[in-house]
C-alpha cells in the first residue's frame, strides 16, 4: 500500500478551553465565583467599543443546577464587579432524574449543541454521593456480588463506565467547563496537655467527591471568602492546583475583572493540550507512588492490577494516562 504524500505545516499554539473546579464549604461563594468566571471567559470583562455589536456574554453561559435552583437567585442581583448577574440558560437535575455522571454528560452535550460557550455544573458532589451516583452504583454491584473485593468492584463495566463519565464531565475541548464541589470539615480527637483532657479539633477540609477527581481539572480553587455586590467585595480563593502559568499554587487571589480577563486572554493565546495532559499524567504517577509507599495492601495487589490492565511489565513512568486513571481508581477503592 502506497503511503500518501505527507503535507507538513507549521504548527501554532491553539486556544484552550478552561477546566476549572471550585471547592468550598456551603455559603463560601462557589456558585458566585463560577458565574463570574463563566462571564469573564466569554469576554464579559473585555474592553469593547460602546458601539460594537457583540453577543451578550450571558447568552453563552449554560448551567446544570443540582442545588434546588440556587443559581436562579443570582439573576439580577448586584455583582462584585459593579454590574449585575445577567440572565443565563440553565436546567435542573433532581433526585428523580438520578445523579449518574452519564446524566451530567447528556445535559452538557445538550448545552453545547444549544450554543454554550461555558457549562457550569453546580455541584458535581451529587454524582459521587447522591442517588444514582457512582457510590450508589458501587453498592448495587456489591449487593449482587457480596464476595467481590473492592478492587474488582471498581473494575466492573457498569461501575467503570460511570467512573469514566465522572471524569469526562470535568473537561471538554468544545467549551469551557466549570464545576463546583462541596467540602466537609474533618475533625479528630487530640489530647490537650494544658487542660489534661481530649478535645475535638478541626484538622482541615475534604472534598465530598472521589479523591482522584482533583487531578482532572487544570485549575482547582478553594474558596476563602465570597464576593458581594453590596458592599462591593471581590471573591477570594486559594489556588490548590494549577496548570496555568498565570497562577501560583498555594497563593490566595482576589478574583477581580482584571484577573478574569487575564485568564481569558491566557487561554485564548493557546496552551498545548499535550502539555496539560502530560502534567496530569505526572500528577497521577505521584499519587500512585504515594499510595504504594504507604499502603501495604495496595502494594500487594498492584502487580495483579497491572497484569489485568495489560501493563504487567511496564514501569509506572511508562503507563499511559488512561490506564493510570483506571489503576488509581482501583487502588483507592479499598
Please name every model-derived segment.
Residues 17-21, 60, 117-120, 176-178:
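Residue-level preference for the first positions of well-ordered beta-strands
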Residues 39, 112-113, 171:
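Residue-level signal for alpha-helix termini/capping positions
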Amino acid at each position: 500500500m502506497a503511503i500518501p504524500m505527507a503535507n507538513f505545516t507549521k504548527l501554532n499554539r491553539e486556544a484552550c478551553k478552561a477546566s476549572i473546579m471550585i471547592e468550598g464549604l456551603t455559603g463560601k461563594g462557589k456558585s458566585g465565583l463560577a458565574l463570574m468566571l463563566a462571564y469573564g471567559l466569554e469576554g464579559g470583562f473585555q474592553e469593547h467599543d460602546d458601539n460594537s455589536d457583540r453577543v451578550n456574554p450571558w447568552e453563552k453561559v449554560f448551567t446544570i443546577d443540582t442545588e434546588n435552583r440556587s443559581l436562579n437567585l443570582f439573576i439580577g442581583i448586584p455583582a462584585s464587579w459593579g454590574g449585575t448577574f445577567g440572565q443565563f440558560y440553565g436546567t435542573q437535575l433532581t433526585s428523580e432524574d438520578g445523579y449518574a455522571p452519564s446524566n451530567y454528560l447528556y445535559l452538557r452535550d445538550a448545552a453545547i449543541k444549544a450554543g454554550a460557550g461555558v457549562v457550569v455544573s453546580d455541584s458535581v458532589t451529587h454524582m459521587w454521593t447522591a442517588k444514582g451516583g457512582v457510590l450508589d452504583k458501587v453498592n448495587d454491584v456489591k449487593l449482587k456480588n457480596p464476595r467481590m473485593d473492592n478492587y474488582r468492584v471498581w473494575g466492573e463495566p457498569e461501575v467503570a463506565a460511570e467512573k469514566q463519565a465522572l471524569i469526562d464531565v470535568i473537561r471538554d475541548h468544545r467549551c469551557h467547563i466549570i464545576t463546583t464541589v462541596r467540602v466537609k470539615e474533618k475533625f479528630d480527637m487530640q489530647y490537650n496537655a494544658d487542660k489534661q483532657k481530649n478535645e475535638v479539633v478541626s484538622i482541615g477540609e475534604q472534598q465530598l467527591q472521589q479523591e482522584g477527581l482533583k487531578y482532572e481539572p487544570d485549575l482547582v480553587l478553594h474558596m476563602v471568602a465570597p464576593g458581594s455586590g453590596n458592599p462591593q467585595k471581590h471573591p477570594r480563593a486559594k489556588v490548590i492546583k494549577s496548570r496555568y502559568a498565570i497562577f501560583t499554587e498555594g497563593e490566595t487571589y482576589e478574583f477581580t475583572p482584571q484577573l478574569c480577563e487575564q485568564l481569558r486572554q491566557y487561554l485564548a493565546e493557546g496552551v498545548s493540550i499535550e502539555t496539560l495532559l502530560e502534567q496530569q499524567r505526572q500528577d497521577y504517577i505521584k499519587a500512585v507512588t504515594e499510595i504504594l509507599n504507604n499502603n501495604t495492601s495496595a502494594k500487594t495487589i498492584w502487580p495483579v492490577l497491572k497484569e489485568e490492565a495489560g501493563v504487567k511489565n511496564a514501569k509506572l513512568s511508562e503507563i499511559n494516562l488512561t490506564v493510570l486513571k483506571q489503576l488509581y481508581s482501583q487502588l483507592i477503592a479499598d
